[in-house]
């Protein structure tokens, strides 16, 4: 299989007060959006719940997830960021090119 030319790490902080079904739904939607952008999820890791340095959307804790994704073209960051901003259970995200 051909190796991906473009690799990114997407770090997502989910609302810790959301129910587990809602979190699973959000994670599934993130993966579906990644696949819709012609990328594949190479790795998905639950980093657990962590105390935040400062409050974000009135939350003092967050559930951290890290997705390593790869594709053969640059990610459409505007479209992906718009999706992440509209997802109600995501309180913060970071997209890094690796």
Regions found by a protein language model. Name each.
Residues 1-62, 70-98:
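Long, contiguous binding/interaction regions
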